[in-house]
C-alpha cells in the first residue's frame, strides 16, 4: 500500500510532551518493535504492536478490532514509536489514519534514543481496557494500481518508492 503525500501527514511529538502524557488514559503509546525487544524494555504504558501483525492482509474491520483491543477509541491520542527512525511507526500511523483515526503522531526519537538520554523505561505491560473505534475508511490516502498507472503519465507527479533497498530488490 502506498500513501499520497499531499493527502496525509504524520505530525511528530517531542519527548517532553510524551513524558507529560505517559500516565494519561486518553493517550496510547504504541511500540512497533518486535515483541522480544518490547519485553526487554519499552516506554512506560506502551503497548506492543509488531508491524507484521498489520501486514497480514486483514480486513479493515479486523484492523479496527485489533486497535480497539489495544484501548484505542475514536478520541484516543496515539503516539507511535520504533527503533528505525519512524520507518515502521509511520506505517502504523498511516494505517490508523486509513481507518479514520484523527489523532496520531510519531515520537520524534527512537526507543534507543529515549533510553540513551536516560528516560524511564519499563518491562511491565499496561492494563488495557478495550475501546470502541468507528471505521471510516480514508480511501483518499490509498494509492491504488489504477492511480499509479495514470499518475506515471503525468508531468506534475513524482512517484517515490521508499522501501528499503532489500525490499525493493525482492
Ranges and model annotations:
Residues 2-7, 54-154:
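Thiolate-centered catalytic microenvironments shared by cysteine-dependent enzyme domains
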Residues 6-75, 149-170:
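Positively charged, proline/Ser/Thr-rich regional signature most characteristic
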Amino acid at each position: 500500500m502506498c500513501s499520497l503525500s499531499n493527502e496525509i501527514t504524520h505530525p511528530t511529538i517531542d519527548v517532553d510532551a510524551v513524558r507529560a502524557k505517559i500516565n494519561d488514559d486518553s493517550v496510547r503509546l504504541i511500540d512497533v518493535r518486535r515483541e522480544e525487544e518490547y519485553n526487554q524494555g519499552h516506554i512506560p504504558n506502551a503497548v506492543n504492536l509488531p508491524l507484521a501483525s498489520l501486514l497480514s492482509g486483514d480486513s479493515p474491520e479486523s484492523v479496527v478490532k485489533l486497535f480497539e483491543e489495544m484501548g484505542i477509541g475514536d478520541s484516543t491520542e496515539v503516539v507511535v514509536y520504533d527503533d528505525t527512525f519512524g520507518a515502521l511507526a509511520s506505517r502504523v500511523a498511516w494505517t490508523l489514519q486509513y481507518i479514520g483515526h484523527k489523532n496520531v503522531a510519531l515520537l520524534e526519537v527512537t526507543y534507543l534514543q529515549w533510553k540513551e538520554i536516560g528516560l524511564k523505561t519499563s518491562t511491565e505491560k499496561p492494563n488495557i481496557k478495550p475501546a470502541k473505534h468507528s471505521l471510516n475508511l480514508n480511501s483518499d490516502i490509498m494509492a491504488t494500481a489504477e492511480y499509479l498507472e495514470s499518475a506515471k503519465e503525468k508531468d506534475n507527479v513524482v512517484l517515490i518508492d521508499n522501501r528499503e533497498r532489500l525490499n525493493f530488490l525482492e
